[in-house]
UniProtKB/Swiss-Prot annotation:
The keyword Cytoplasm does not apply. This is Neurexin-1-beta. It is found in: Presynaptic cell membrane. SUPFAM superfamilies: Concanavalin A-like lectins/glucanases. Residues 47-391 are extracellular.
């Protein structure tokens, strides 16, 4: 295309075109050169934009664990070295309480809880979730004799699960993850193997869940009472009303720091920092915002996948951690403090007849804390940052070239329309004799030829022959 334009310009500027042809050639060249430069600029800009796709690989361990459900991008507050919102509970204790609105209290068959903490206490209550008054369902994360454990009841008996191998009251930062599905439960501290708990009377829950779909709603309570008599394990945590953080109300106040609490998609500490209307703070509680960098841990950053043997549909949030071999102690390396990925999927309401209050579906997110202090994140992980400006440079260059061409074309048309119409040169030396005579002031007298002479002249003219 550029060669064709150059040929056109050359033809316009050829000698045969005269002065107007030379001007046209110059205008054509003025039009072609900016177009070429603009096109090259657009291509270069587009190439630089295409090169803006960065894939940041965080090198470390070559092990990679697949996650069975979709991963959502972590909140901005949890990227770049933050472990989530942190509160310090001083001497004397304090308490952060979240209350669900009366018409929005969820009933769940599965629960997910994750939190980071550091303390030197041997006895304390970290988090407790209670149902509405009179129901008696609860879930409690506590420290007993320096060991972390969870105790819950969803309508049958108290079920307890504890990590007895990990010492967590050493003043170092630890992360605990708890999952519940019906009466089954898993517990993991840092990178230690996942502890599982399957209570008695919970083996036929899959067939029971299928059968309950065909039981009329009015008979649901009767069936549940009959199942209780048969020793069946109930599965629904009914009408959750409050989340209590700090344990002051239970008489075992927590002293230390708590970071990044996530419960079924709720980021309670973040909400407390934002002065949420449903949260009340009492006692000696102070917002820090991040975990102190002086605290370290010897736990590895390898995520664990919790193994759930039950096949009951999980209707709340889902926690995915990578699988670890049972009986194999965790590899201990002196690395900086880390917290593990907390994966939360969208939630749905249970359709079990045991539900008391209807719940509404909620959506979760991914809490992806990284290492504190701005150091390298988890080994083997990769973050892909895609920029949407891959074609912006090309488009801008083309638009600029087109606009410049239009301006030059309009200028050329303007110059062409306003050109001179032409001038005529008159040779004064070749005037008629009559004009010369008149210019000298002499008057030429016209002679009146006689009729006879004119007749003879006409006769002679008839006899003449003309050759062309």
């Amino acid at each position: 295309m550029y060669q064709r334009m150059l040929r056109c310009g050359a033809e316009l500027g050829s000698p045969g075109g005269g002065s107007s042809g030379g001007a046209g050639g110059r205008l054509a060249l003025l039009w072609i050169v900016p177009l070429t430069l603009s096109g090259l600029l657009g291509v270069a800009w587009g190439a630089s934009s295409l090169g803006a796709h960065h894939i940041h690989h965080f090198h470390g361990s070559s092990k990679h664990h697949s996650v069975p459900i979709a991963i959502y991008r972590s909140p901005a507050s949890l990227r770049g070295g933050h472990a989530g919102t942190t509160y310090i509970f001083s001497k004397g204790g304090g308490q952060i309480t979240y209350k669900w609105p009366p018409n929005d209290r969820p009933s769940t068959r599965a629960d997910r809880l994750a939190i980071g903490f550091s303390t030197v206490q041997k006895e304390a209550v970290l988090v407790r979730v209670d149902s509405s008054s009179g129901l008696g369902d609860y879930l409690e994360l506590h420290i007993h004799q320096g060991k972390i454990g969870v105790k819950f009841n969803v309508g049958t008996d108290d079920i307890a699960i504890e990590e007895s191998n990990a010492i967590i009251n050493d003043g170092k930062y630890h992360v605990v993850r708890f999952t519940r599905s019906g009466g089954n439960a898993t517990l993991q501290v840092d990178s230690w193997p996942v502890i599982e708990r399957y209570p008695a009377g919970n083996n036929d829950n899959e067939r029971l869940a299928i059968a309950r779909q065909r039981i009329p709603y009015r008979l649901g309570r009767v069936v549940d009472e009959w199942l209780l008599d048969k020793g069946r394990q109930l599965t629904i945590f009914n009408s959750q009303a409050t989340i209590i953080i700090g344990g002051k109300e239970q008489g075992q106040p927590f002293q230390g720091q708590l970071s990044g609490l996530y419960y079924n998609g709720l980021k309670v500490l973040n909400m407390a920092a934002e002065n949420d209307a449903n949260i009340a703070i009492v006692g000696n509680v102070r917002l820090v915002g991040e975990v102190p960098s002086s605290m370290t841990t010897e736990s590895t950053a390898t995520a664990m996948q919790s193994e759930m043997s039950t096949s009951i549909m999980e209707t709340t949030t889902t926690l995915a951690t990578s699988t670890a071999r049972r009986g194999k102690p965790p590899t201990k390396e002196p690395i900086s403090q880390t917290t593990d990925d907390i994966l939360v999927a969208s939630a749905e309401c249970p359709s079990d007849d045991e539900d008391i209050d209807p719940c509404e579906p909620s959506s979760g997110g991914l809490a992806n804390p990284t290492r504190v202090g701005g150091r390298e994140p988890y080994p083997g992980s990769a973050e892909v940052i895609r920029e949407s400006s891959s074609t912006t440079g090309m488009v801008v260059g083309i638009v600029a070239a087109a606009a410049l061409c239009i301006l030059i074309l309009l200028y050329a048309m303007y110059k062409y329309r306003n050109r001179d119409e032409g001038s005529y040169h008159v040779d004064e030396s070749r005037n008629y004799i009559s004009n010369s005579a008149q210019s000298n002031g002499a008057v030429v007298k016209e002679k009146q030829p006689s009729s006879a002479k004119s007749a003879n002249k006409n006769k002679k003219n008839k006899d003449k022959e003309y050759y062309v």
